[in-house]
């Protein structure tokens, strides 16, 4: 198994970035809860709800919608996962907490890629909203555009690293990763739109 280790510099978003980097939802929830304790914002519990929705959606995709096609090339996990090249009964040996047991789940779509794309999409839109709300890019020009890009870029890079690792470790095929990412982006946009409308309604009510 090809293990990839990444180091993220300490920033105000480092907990979230590291969580997205690992691709393990449990770490993300812990990171968001930690951030909420340090400085409570309604966006944190909202994101946890979105995470639960995303997880349930992925389970429905794998265990209901695409389960009938288990065994086909599109849904089967790639041969060679966990160092078992040429076998079709590849063990679940690519995760951080690998059990070594035979994988019984569909590889379509990639749950890690779906989550990484969802999280990155949501937080990127959140950063853009904050800049629009504060009107920074209208008053400071290029400097604020650069600062905004530097805040957004890590989320993009982290999501891409997760997706790349899922393919290189042969946990998923490229198709499974791309489709998972597409679903994640849709859920991320949907979740942010709901959050945005919720905040606008709250503001009007006040």
Q: Where are the predicted features?
A:
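N-terminal transmembrane-helix/juxtamembrane module of multi-pass inner/ER membrane proteins
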Residues: 1-105
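Membrane-embedded catalytic cores of phosphoryl/pyrophosphoryl-handling enzymes
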Residues: 40, 78-206
């Amino acid at each position: 198994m090809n293990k990839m280790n990444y180091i993220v510099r300490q920033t105000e978003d480092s907990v979230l970035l590291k969580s997205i980097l690992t691709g393990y939802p449990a770490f993300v929830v812990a990171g968001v809860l930690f951030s909420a304790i340090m400085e409570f914002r309604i966006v944190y519990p909202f994101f946890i709800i979105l995470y639960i929705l995303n997880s349930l959606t992925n389970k429905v995709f794998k265990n209901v919608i695409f389960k009938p096609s288990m065994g086909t090339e599109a849904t089967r996990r790639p041969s060679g996962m966990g160092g078992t090249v040429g076998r079709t009964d590849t063990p679940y040996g690519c995760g951080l907490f690998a059990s070594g047991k035979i994988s019984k789940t569909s590889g379509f779509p990639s749950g890690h890629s779906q989550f990484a794309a969802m999280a990155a999409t949501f937080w990127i839109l959140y950063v853009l909203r904050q800049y629009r709300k504060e009107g920074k890019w209208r008053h400071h020009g290029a400097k604020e555009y650069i600062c905004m890009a530097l805040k957004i870029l890590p989320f993009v890079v982290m999501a891409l690293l997760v997706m790349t690792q899922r393919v290189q470790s042969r946990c998923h095929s490229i198709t499974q990763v791309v489709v998972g990412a597409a679903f994640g982006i849709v859920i991320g946009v949907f979740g942010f739109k709901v959050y945005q409308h919720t905040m606008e309604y709250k503001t009007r009510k006040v």
